[in-house]
Amino acid sequence: MSKRIGKSLVVNGATLVTEAAWNAELEAKHEKLVEFLNANKLAGVLIRRNENVAWLTGGAVELRVLTPCETGVATLLVTAAGKRYYFTTENEAPRLHDEEFGALDFEPVLFPWWADDTNAAAAKLAGGPLGSDTPGAGLTPVSLAPLRLALGDAEIARYRWLGAQTAAATVEALNKVEPGMSEYDLEAITAAALLRRGILPSVYLFAVDDRILKYKHAVARGNRLERYAMLNLCSRKWGLAISITRFVHFGALPAELAERFRAAAQVNAALLNATRVGATSADLFAVAQAAYAAQGFPGEERFHHQGGPTGYGEREWIATPAGAEVVVNNQAFAWNPSIRGGKVEDTVLLRNGVIENLTSTPDLPALEAKVKGSEYVAAGVLVK
């Protein structure tokens, strides 16, 4: 169970983020956003997207009511003069005041539910041109993704907890998988393990047997498990996203499939070893391409993207042949190399030249791979 006590974040009775750390996080993000506004000659910015709301508020504010929706029940306004507002309807106001914005320095602006006039009211308060992270008449489109990429200490503390708990939930579900279960059953037991921890599933690609080999994105279709199951998921809490994939096989793992996992782990190791400050998206794509060829699977990179940085998006960008995006310090990554039914995927953090696995599952079989003298560990298949 997690909750705010004052401005501290307490999880299961332990303080995860102190009030001082949270205050520092909020102030740093506010300053960064005001600098962004001044650099872009904007009087203010409207923030509606859930990932940006979570980023700006240090994971404190949850505006999501409709789960699949990218926006919630309020809009934030930050002005170049440093003022902060949230716009919402009168029916949402009591909960937002009590449970979301009570510890934050945001001024509410309220409307009847049938007469939301956020854009006009925001323009008047800002007194000049407005940017927005969602389209709108008279608004300048802006992306806040570049501001989100480098994670601060408080974000890393939350991320470590989320990674460890998502990994634990995944292993809990994996150990409950039995032949005869449907793909929907696999989704249900995994969702239960996550939701009990206060974690929201955001991507579900669960499949069994030949569907794993045939499809890279195999959404559940109700097939019943005979021998081989894949739990491929993303989870969210405090706006942060975790990616993890794990497998279980009943009976001896076929040698051909075991070889594909070994090769995928080697590609993963090559990507992790190359994930260093200053590396570009194109550099990393080339590393994956060369690694597949070196493992005897040339061209395998064509069949699916290889992953990229994560954080407040399941992928903030993905590695592409001409990608110009650049790796920064304190950035999270989720690489997902795969070879026809064999795949490895974890969420890791690059911090001061060191790769930290946030979703380690030491109770599962391990695949060790070395690149240029450095060893990297990926999860193998649980064989029952």
Predicted features by range, described:
Residues 1-384:
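Active-site neighborhoods and metal-handling regions in enzymes and metal-associated proteins
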